[in-house]
């Protein structure tokens, strides 16, 4: 009977014995394989005497046999003991003498046994949002600005104009790298320049030359400029004002075949806003549930699972780097470790919620989710059919729905309060 020993944390160790006769039988089987293909001078292929095969290939046959026997015996034990393994085990052979029992140790990690607690202590604030006509008006204004043209103006520049400037910056009378440009087009009001720069341009007209005194922020990205006072000599070459398109049928038609009137456009916008709002609210509530679960349930996680998650995050980083997996692989482990650990913890907690509540993906919710996704496309029926025929996509959606149901299970026990909020507060929380 093998005794499983706890070494540290979630690491376990067990000593396993393989009977000598089983080992020798496995070695003989390996030798048969070598005998079939062995080429030895003076003998035909497959006709080499057994003692010569054993002499030449005995060591290799024994290694191959153990490579098969060790994991087989370990996983038989893991199945029998119902071990919830995390990652692959490592083996160390203690005795492998010919004719004797083979004794080896397996070191491995297991997933923790999660016992959910403190659900009633989790506090969740659910925003209650109504999309108003003013919200729709604001969205239409955004669309108009996206389609805007620019007209040259002789008026003084203001915070919503576009200006073309030449500038040359100095610090203590000396020019610095990156501080000079010609025909630089600046969209005012977007905060692209350091504080005080745009404000210094406002009120000036095309053709004017003037100086601006500014100070680089203490956290500026260029080390040599942090916190430094600078003077910029400006030549304002052009001021342009934004010209918004009228809400005509021609303008409305740009936003899809189903938008023929302003009323149609407003309906489409409101529909999209409702979908975006629903996703944002779901995400916000889920994040609060996750934060609450982690605060109430401190659980150890196996290093192997964290390592696997780090590789997933590195892969995602590679996608952001344009598929450069070599560059992503060089990113330090520390960059991903905390996020990876958190993701493993969340996965374990959600897994326990799903298991303890015997949850299964609600197919009606899956269907509704597909229809919601499809409604954003011009041919929703084709999108629905595409999802229904793609098992991988369907399983991904079922997992999303299952997580939503797990969140619902927590909300049923948590302290939930409602708070009225505006559409803009939810969609632009950093604004």
Swiss-Prot record:
Its EC number is 5.2.1.8. Keywords: Cell cycle, Cell division, Chaperone, Cytoplasm, Isomerase, Rotamase. Residues 160-245 form the PPIase FKBP-type domain. InterPro entries: PPIase_dom_sf, PPIase_FKBP_dom, Trig_fac, Trigger_fac_C, Trigger_fac_C_sf, Trigger_fac_ribosome-bd_bac, Trigger_fac_ribosome-bd_sf, Trigger_fact/SurA_dom_sf. It is found in: Cytoplasm. SUPFAM superfamilies: FKBP-like (SSF54534), Triger factor/SurA peptide-binding domain-like (SSF109998), Trigger factor ribosome-binding domain (SSF102735). It holds the Pfam family Trigger_C. It catalyses: [protein]-peptidylproline (omega=180) = [protein]-peptidylproline (omega=0). One of its GO terms (molecular function) is protein folding chaperone. One of its GO terms (cellular component) is cytoplasm. One of its GO terms (biological process) is chaperone-mediated protein folding. Consists of 3 domains; the N-terminus binds the ribosome, the middle domain has PPIase activity, while the C-terminus has intrinsic chaperone activity on its own. Involved in protein export. Acts as a chaperone by maintaining the newly synthesized protein in an open conformation. Functions as a peptidyl-prolyl cis-trans isomerase. Belongs to the FKBP-type PPIase family. Tig subfamily. This is Trigger factor. It comes from Actinobacillus succinogenes (strain ATCC 55618 / DSM 22257 / CCUG 43843 / 130Z).
């Amino acid at each position: 009977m093998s005794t499983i020993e706890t070494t540290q944390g979630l690491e376990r160790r067990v000593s396993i014995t393989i009977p000598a006769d089983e080992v020798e039988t496995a070695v003989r089987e390996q030798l048969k394989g070598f005998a079939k293909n062995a080429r030895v001078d003076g003998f035909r292929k497959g006709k080499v005497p057994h003692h010569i095969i054993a002499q030449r290939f005995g060591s290799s046959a024994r290694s191959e046999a153990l490579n098969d026997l060790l994991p087989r015996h370990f996983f038989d034990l893991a199945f029998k003991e119902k071990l919830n393994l995390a990652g692959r085990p490592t083996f160390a052979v203690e005795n492998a003498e010919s004719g004797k029992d083979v004794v080896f140790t397996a070191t491995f990690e297991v997933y923790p046994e999660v016992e959910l607690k403190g659900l009633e202590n989790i506090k969740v604030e659910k925003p209650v949002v109504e999309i108003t006509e003013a919200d729709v008006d604001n969205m239409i204004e955004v669309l108009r600005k996206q389609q805007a043209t620019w007209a040259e103006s002789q008026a003084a520049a203001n915070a919503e104009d576009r200006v073309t400037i030449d500038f040359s910056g100095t610090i203590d009378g000396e020019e610095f790298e990156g501080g000079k440009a010609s025909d630089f087009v600046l969209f005012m009001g977007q905060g692209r320049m350091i504080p005080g720069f745009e404000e210094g341009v406002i009120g000036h007209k095309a053709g004017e030359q003037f100086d601006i005194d500014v100070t680089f922020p203490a956290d500026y990205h260029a080390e040599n400029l942090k916190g430094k006072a600078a003077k910029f000599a400006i030549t304002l070459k052009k001021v342009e004002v934004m010209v918004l398109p009228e809400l005509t049928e021609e303008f409305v038609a740009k936003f899809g075949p189903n938008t023929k009137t302003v009323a149609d456009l407003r309906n489409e916008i409101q529909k999209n806003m409702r979908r975006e709002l629903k996703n944002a609210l779901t995400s916000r509530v889920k994040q609060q549930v996750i934060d609450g679960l982690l605060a109430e349930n401190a659980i150890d996680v196996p290093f192997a699972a964290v390592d696997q998650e780090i590789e997933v995050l590195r892969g995602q980083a590679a996608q952001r780097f344009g598929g450069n997996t070599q560059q992503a692989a060089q990113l330090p482990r520390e960059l991903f470790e905390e996020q990876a650990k958190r993701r493993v913890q969340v996965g374990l907690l959600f897994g326990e919620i799903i298991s303890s509540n015997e949850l299964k993906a609600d197919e009606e919710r899956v269907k509704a989710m597909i229809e919601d996704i499809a409604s954003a496309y011009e041919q929703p029926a084709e999108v629905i059919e595409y999802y229904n025929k793609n098992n991988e996509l369907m399983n991904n959606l079922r997992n999303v729905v299952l997580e939503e149901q797990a969140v619902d299970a927590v909300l049923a026990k948590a302290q939930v309060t409602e708070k009225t909020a505006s559409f803009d507060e939810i969609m632009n929380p950093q604004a």
